[in-house]
């Protein structure tokens, strides 16, 4: 049997040696040729023992051909759908007797050959419709011209074809073990561990094998190329390969066959018009999110743990054994599993009028419950975010009544209802963990537990007023009379904004500071917000040194809030 690597070479060969049998495969030359994928790209001739890729426009058939020169030849043809179900059939036409005997070596005139050839639809050997990887296998095939016709009726599609006359020795696809199932051996909220039996192709035959795991949320895949096709969807139209050279009546004449004129022109007309129509009507397909499907190749390990999954989510897992020498793969029987739910968090009970300290992990959540004993008309909720911003959600008897991002101190007024219960959810930021102080109260009027803050909590330093032993700073106040305490701390020359940001915990009060760091405390307010500014000169500093200044405002109940820290430096020479 001979399957040539290109149509042009095949026609020249037959023209030159009309009366002789086609030569058998030169293995050394074949191995060199199959490495050159361009020789087989979009060719209508199927090479012996090499996998080729193709592309179909919807409703537009493609035909591939090969010749088996001797009777009783083993034959294997495998078709792998990638994007969509395919319909394919394999037919056989016997070689004309005058082409199989010994000849003079001189080609006959073309017109005379046409008169000797009659149209023949051939014998149908195998048909299939679906998206499985399917094969035609025969231990003893007759000689003749074989035609493989493929069509996709759903959409434009990629596919792969492999065929060989030496299936016993080639074995390009990794062999599945006796138990080809993928097992889930461990299941967590964000992790799944998979295990499978190794392929004998690697463990027994010593072929180079690696395993690739595909994870997605939709369904299992029957081939690796189907998974890769899903991953490679673009934000633009799918790009098809350029049309290649198809067989013409001239080619068939020298094989000893010719299709009828009507069939040939009808196919040409339908192919051209369908292809044009499909090019114009192909739909825009958005690219799936990266997280929706992943492919991870892990070498020759047969146990693998997938991490960073979402809790309470169903995933589908497929394992493919890939022969890295041939780049051909075989699918194990895939599986699916649902990750475990998030552990239900303990709900913290809030007491009326009492401050509760809360810690929330990075990107984590904490739930608080407030159930006033007496009937109430209003609930006042104070939230003091000490570090990064947090999201606050409040539900009253299951109904969402508040959803806000909170930085610093915020106060919310919620309308009350008799016997109402409130569920408060605090969600941490992506940056880091959060510490909060939370207070809920039904008591109307009275002094507030947290001090009022101005919109701007920065401390301003006056550069022109710096000396070798003092600095002058200012900060904004409010219309509420509060106590302000100033603290200083000497820091190194390398101390920068990153250090300051890391230490910016607004909930740490003056009680956390050393007595030696205290500068002063004073009361301050202004009925006119435009004039609610106070200044202070801090003395007793050393020349050329850096200091971190902090201002704390203390509320009536003793709760304090820290302004943004300020880094200052005294003059070195005066």
Curated annotation (Swiss-Prot):
InterPro entries: FN3_dom (IPR003961), FN3_sf (IPR036116), Ig-like_fold (IPR013783), NDNF (IPR019326), NDNF_C (IPR045805), NDNF_Fn(III)_1 (IPR055271), NDNF_N (IPR056225). One of its GO terms (biological process) is gonadotrophin-releasing hormone neuronal migration to the hypothalamus. This is Protein NDNF. Transmembrane segments: none annotated. The keyword Repeat applies. The lineage of its organism: Eukaryota, Metazoa, Chordata, Craniata, Vertebrata. Coiled coil: none annotated. Disruption phenotype: Morpholino knockdown of the protein alters the migration of gonadotropin-releasing hormone (GnRH) expressing neurons. One of its GO terms (molecular function) is heparin binding. Residues 174-329, 451-560 form the Fibronectin type-III domain. Glycans are attached at residue 327. It comes from the Eukaryota. It comes from Danio rerio (Zebrafish).
């Amino acid at each position: 049997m001979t399957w040539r690597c290109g149509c042009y070479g095949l026609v020249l060969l037959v023209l030159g040696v009309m009366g002789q049998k086609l030569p058998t495969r030169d293995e050394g030359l074949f191995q060199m040729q199959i490495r050159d994928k361009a020789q087989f790209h979009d060719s209508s001739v199927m090479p012996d023992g090499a996998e080729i890729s193709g592309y179909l426009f919807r409703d537009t058939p493609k035909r591939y051909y090969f010749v088996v020169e001797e009777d009783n030849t083993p034959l294997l043809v495998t078709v792998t759908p990638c994007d969509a179900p395919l319909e394919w059939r394999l037919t056989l036409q016997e070689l004309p007797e005058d082409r199989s005997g010994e000849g003079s070596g001189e080609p006959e005139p073309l017109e005379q050959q046409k008169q000797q050839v009659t149209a023949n639809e051939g014998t149908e050997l195998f048909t299939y419709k679906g998206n499985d990887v399917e094969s035609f296998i025969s231990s003893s095939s007759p000689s003749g011209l074989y035609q493989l016709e493929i069509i996709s009726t759903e959409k434009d599609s990629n596919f792969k074809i492999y065929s060989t006359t030496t299936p016993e020795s080639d074995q390009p696809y990794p062999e599945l073990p006796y138990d080809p199932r993928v097992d889930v051996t461990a299941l967590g909220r964000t992790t799944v561990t998979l295990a499978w039996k190794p392929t004998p192709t690697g463990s027994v035959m010593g072929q180079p094998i690696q395993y690739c795991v595909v994870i997605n949320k939709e369904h299992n895949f029957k081939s690796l190329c189907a998974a890769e096709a899903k991953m490679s969807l673009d934000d633009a139209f799918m790009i098809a390969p350029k049309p290649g050279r198809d067989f013409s009546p001239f080619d068939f004449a020298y094989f000893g066959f010719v299709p009828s004129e009507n069939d040939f022109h009808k196919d040409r007309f339908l192919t051209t018009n369908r292809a044009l129509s499909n090019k114009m009507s192909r739909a825009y397909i958005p690219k799936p999110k990266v997280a929706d499907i992943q492919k991870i190749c892990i070498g020759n390990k047969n146990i693998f743990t997938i991490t960073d999954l979402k809790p309470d989510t169903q995933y589908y897992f497929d394992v493919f054994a890939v022969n890295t020498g041939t780049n051909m793969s075989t699918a194990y029987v895939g599986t699916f599993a649902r990750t475990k739910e998030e552990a239900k968090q303990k709900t913290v009970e809030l007491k009326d009028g009492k401050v509760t300290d809360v810690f929330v992990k990075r990107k984590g959540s904490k739930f608080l419950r407030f159930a006033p004993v007496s009937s109430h008309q209003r609930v006042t909720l104070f939230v003091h975010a000490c570090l990064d911003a947090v999201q606050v959600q409040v539900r009253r008897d299951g109904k969402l009544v508040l959803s806000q991002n909170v930085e610093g101190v915020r106060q919310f007024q919620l309308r009350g209802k008799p016997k109402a219960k409130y569920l408060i959810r605090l969600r941490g930021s992506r940056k880091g963990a959060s510490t909060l102080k939370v207070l809920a109260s039904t008591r109307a009027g009275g002094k507030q537990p947290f001090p009022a803050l101005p919109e701007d909590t920065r401390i301003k330093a006056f550069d022109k007023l710096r000396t070798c032993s003092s600095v002058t700073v200012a900060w904004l106040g409010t219309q509420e009379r509060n106590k302000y305490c100033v603290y200083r701390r000497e820091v190194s020359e390398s101390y920068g904004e990153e250090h300051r940001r890391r230490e910016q915990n607004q909930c740490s009060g003056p009680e956390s500071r050393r007595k030696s760091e205290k500068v002063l405390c004073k009361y301050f307010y202004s009925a006119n917000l435009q004039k609610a500014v106070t200044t202070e000169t801090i003395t007793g500093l050393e020349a050329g040194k850096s200091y971190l200044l902090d201002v704390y405002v203390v509320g009536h109940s003793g709760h304090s809030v820290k302004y943004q820290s300020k880094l200052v430096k005294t003059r070195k020479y005066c």
